[in-house]
Regions:
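Active-site metal-binding motif and surrounding structural segment of the metallo-beta-lactamase
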Residues: 40-91, 119-121
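Short, surface-exposed amphipathic charged segments that create phosphate/polyanion-binding patches used
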Residues: 126-138, 304-311
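Conserved beta-strand hairpin/beta-sheet module of binuclear metal-dependent hydrolase folds
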Residues: 1-49, 85-87, 150-152, 159, ...
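Active-site neighborhood of divalent metal-dependent phosphoester bond hydrolases
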Residues: 84-88, 93-121
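Cap/insert and terminal regions of metallo-dependent hydrolase folds
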Residues: 179-301
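Divalent metal-coordination and catalytic microenvironments
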Residues: 6, 37, 46, 63, ...
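Active-site-proximal loop/helix segment associated with metal-binding centers of metalloenzymes
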Residues: 16, 129-221, 227
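Active-site metal-binding loops of divalent metal-dependent hydrolases
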Residues: 11-13, 41, 64, 95, ...
Length: 311
C-alpha cells in the first residue's frame, strides 16, 4: 500500500493558546516527507511523533507571518548539527532567503548541506514542484501579505497485472504492459491490455489553504480534492473580524469544501479566543458534514481508490 498521510503538528493561530502549537503539518507521500509551514515548536512536535528531521525532503512555507515560519531557523540549525548532507529545498516567499542568511551570519553558522529557497508562484495553478511521487501546484490565497496555498496531487500509478494472467506475460514485457501496451503472443495473437491488467488507483490529492479570506475563486482548483485543509480562524459571529484581518470563518471554509466537492474538510488555525473547537466544528458541519477539527499529533490517511465516490 502506497502511503498518503497527513500528520497535523500545530493548529493554532497567531497568539499562543494552551494545548495548541502554531501551524505546521507533515505530509507523507510514499514515505517521502514534506513539511508544510513551520511555526514555533515544530521541532518539538516532530520529536514527539518520532520523525527523523533528516528525512524531510522539502519544506513549503505559505507566508511570512511568524506563526507559520518562526520554527524554521531552529529546524535548519538542528539538521546542520545532526550532520545533514543532502540538499534541502524550501519553497517560500522571496524575502525568506535574506532572513535565513542574516540569522546564519549572525550566529556564525556555515551549513554542512546545500540550502536553496525557491520562490512561490503568484498565480493559482502554477507549478511549484514535481517529483516521481507528487506534483505540487500553487493556490493564490487572499491575505495581508503574499500567501500561497499548496495542492499536492499524487502522480498517476501504473496499471496492475492480473494474477491469473501474469504467467503469460514475459518478464521483459511486464513494465510495458503495466503502462498500457497490448501483448502479442508468439503465434500472433494479440491480448488486449484490459484482459491482462487492473485499473490503477486514482491519484490522490491534498489541498492546504492556510491564512486566507473567503476565496470562492479557488473552487475550480480544488475540485474533487480528497482532503482539504482550510483555515477557520473565526465563527460567523465574528465574520466582520474575519473580513478585517483577511481570515475565514468555519462556515466559509465549509462552503468552499462543499462547492469543490471535497472528500473531507479539515479545519485549523483556530483563534486563541476559542478554548474548544466545537463551535467552529458545528458551524462547518451544518454546511459540510464531512468536516473534522484538526487534532495535533493525529494522522489523516487518504486511502487508495479505483473509482470516484459519489458523496
Amino acid at each position: 500500500m502506497r502511503r498518503f498521510e497527513l500528520l497535523t503538528l500545530g493548529t493554532g493561530a497567531a497568539l499562543p493558546a494552551r494545548g495548541r502549537y502554531p501551524t505546521a503539518q507533515l505530509l507523507n507521500v510514499h514515505d517521502a516527507l514534506y513539511l508544510i509551514d513551520c511555526g514555533e515548536g515544530t521541532q518539538e512536535r516532530l520529536r514527539e511523533q518520532g520523525v527523523n528531521f533528516l528525512r524531510i525532503e522539502r519544506i513549503f512555507i505559505s507566508h511570512l507571518h511568524g506563526d507559520h515560519y518562526l520554527g524554521l531557523q531552529g529546524l535548519i540549525s538542528s539538521m546542520h548539527l545532526m550532520g545533514r548532507r543532502t540538499p534541502l529545498v524550501i519553497h517560500a516567499p522571496q524575502p525568506l532567503k535574506g532572513i535565513i542568511d542574516i540569522q546564519l551570519h549572525a550566529s556564525g553558522t556555515y551549513l554542512r548541506y546545500p540550502l536553496q529557497v525557491q520562490v512561490n508562484p503568484d498565480r493559482s495553478g502554477d507549478p511549484v514542484h514535481t517529483d516521481d511521487r507528487v506534483q505540487v501546484t500553487a493556490l493564490a490565497l487572499k491575505h495581508r501579505v503574499p500567501t500561497t496555498g499548496f495542492l499536492f496531487r499524487e502522480r498517476p500509478a501504473s496499471r496492475g497485472l492480473r494474477h491469473d494472467r501474469v504467467a503469460v506475460i514475459p518478464h521483459y514485457l511486464r513494465d510495458k504492459v503495466k503502462q498500457g501496451a497490448d501483448l502479442t503472443l508468439a503465434d500472433g495473437t494479440v491480448l488486449p491490455n484490459e484482459e491482462l491488467t487492473l485499473p490503477p488507483p486514482l491519484p490522490r490529492a491534498y489541498a492546504y489553504c492556510s491564512d486566507t479570506a473567503y476565496a470562492p475563486e479557488l473552487v475550480p482548483q480544488l475540485q474533487g480534492v480528497d482532503l482539504l485543509y482550510h483555515e477557520a480562524t473565526f465563527t460567523e459571529q465574528l465574520a466582520g473580524r474575519a473580513r478585517e484581518t483577511l481570515h475565514s470563518t468555519a462556515a466559509q471554509a465549509a462552503t468552499i469544501a462543499r462547492e469543490a466537492g471535497a472528500g473531507r474538510l479539515l479545519l485549523g488555525h483556530f483563534s486563541s479566543r476559542y478554548k474548544s473547537e466545537q463551535p467552529l466544528l458545528q458551524e462547518a458541519q451544518a454546511i459540510f458534514p464531512r468536516t473534522e477539527a484538526a487534532r495535533e499529533g493525529h494522522r489523516y490517511t487518504i486511502v487508495e481508490r479505483t473509482h470516484v465516490e459519489n458523496f
